[in-house]
C-alpha cells in the first residue's frame, strides 16, 4: 500500500520504590525510534534521576521517550497530578507479561522487551542500543499525520508472514509539565516532567497487512496533549515493531 503523503509528521520506520515529546526531528526515514517508557511518580524520591534521564532522551532523534506517572504512590500523602489508572494498568500488564511479581518505580521498559531500573543510565543506554540494532530486522513502517477532519495512521506490511498480531496504541503527550509537589517524599520540590502521557488507548489491530486507521479529529480535541505518538506492539504488551510521532497537531489545545 502506498501511504498517503505525510504532512507535519515524523515518519520513523524503522534505589527502587516497590509497593505492597519530544522525539527529535531529522531521524533517517529507514529507521524507527526506540520506544522508552518510564513509569514514575511524583511521590517517589528514587524517581528523580530517572526523570532527569528521560529528559535527556528527548534530545535524541532515535528515541521516543514517554513518561507515565502511576497512582499507587498516592498513598504516601501526595496525589500525583499527572498519574492515571491507565498508566498503572499498563505497567501491571507489562509485569504480568514479563512474569514479574510486582511493579516498581522508577522502571524503564525499552521497546516493550527490556525491563531496566530507570535510574541506571548505563543499563538504559545499553538496552536502547541493543534494540536499535535488533529492531532493524523486524521494523514496520508507521506514519501519522492529520487532515482537515481526521488523524490518519498508516501501518505498513510485515516481511514476517507468521508474525503475531499487534496492537496499535495512540498516546497523547504533553511535552513539558512543571509541578510544585506539596507532599510525599518529594515535598517542596518543583519538578519539570517531559513527554508526559496524558491519555492512551488502543485504536486498532494490525495483522501483518497494510492498515489504515482514520480517527475523527472531533474526538481528539481538548485532550491533555500537544503531541501524539503511535506505537505498534506485538500482542498487547510485547515488543515494539513500529512507532511514529506527530508533534503539535492542529487539534491540540493552545499551549
What name fits each language-model region?
Residues 79-101, 114, 118-255:
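Short, conserved sequence motifs used for protein processing/export or organelle targeting and
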Residues 111:
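Conserved residues at the C-terminal ends of beta-strands
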Residues 9-19:
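Bacterial N-terminal signal peptides
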Residues 14, 49-55, 171-177:
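Short N-terminal helix-initiation segments at or just after the protein's N-terminus
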Residues 1-11:
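Bacterial N-terminal signal peptides that target proteins for export
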Residues 24-104:
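Active-site-proximal cofactor/substrate-binding loop regions of enzyme domains
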